[in-house]
Amino acid sequence: MAFKHQLILSTAILLAVLAAASASFREQCVPGREITYESLNARREYAVRQTCGYYLSAERQKRRCCDELSKVPELCWCEVLRILMDRRVTKEGVVKDSLLQDMSRCKKLTREFIAGIVGRE
């Protein structure tokens, strides 16, 4: 009987720890905290340059993108790319369309490019 209670208690503690870790992860990968607005814009500019052919210094943009990404914890990298491709949150907390919404001509190519970046990791 004592073993059963100990097992239930251990399971409850484990579930509480997992729930706390999950909440902490969700709170950490939020624009404005670990994910800076500057880093989102740096990645947008680099992705657009690579796929849409706009003339910007490719090396400078790549360096800026990588520098900004290095400031974000690795566990948030996929969230950064998801925000870049699907939606964004302004400094005021307003949810907007994708940072690439205005690039409809290049959006598909840019999505493929971003998917390739994630696939390389």
From Swiss-Prot:
Transmembrane spans: none
Keywords, in A-Z order: Protease inhibitor, Secreted, Serine protease inhibitor, Signal
Main location: secreted
Signal peptide range: 1-24
Places the protein is found: Secreted
Record-level Gene Ontology MF annotations: serine-type endopeptidase inhibitor activity
Pfam families per the UniProt record, alphabetical: Tryp_alpha_amyl (PF00234)
GO CC terms in record: extracellular region
CDD domains recorded: AAI_SS
Keyword check for Signal: yes
Annotated coiled-coil segments of the chain: none
Family annotation (PANTHER family): TRYPSIN/FACTOR XIIA INHIBITOR-RELATED (PTHR34481), TRYPSIN_ALPHA-AMYLASE INHIBITOR CMX1_CMX3 (PTHR34481:SF15)
Homology family: Belongs to the protease inhibitor I6 (cereal trypsin/alpha-amylase inhibitor) family.
Name of the protein: Trypsin/alpha-amylase inhibitor CMX2
Source organism of this protein record: Triticum aestivum (Wheat)
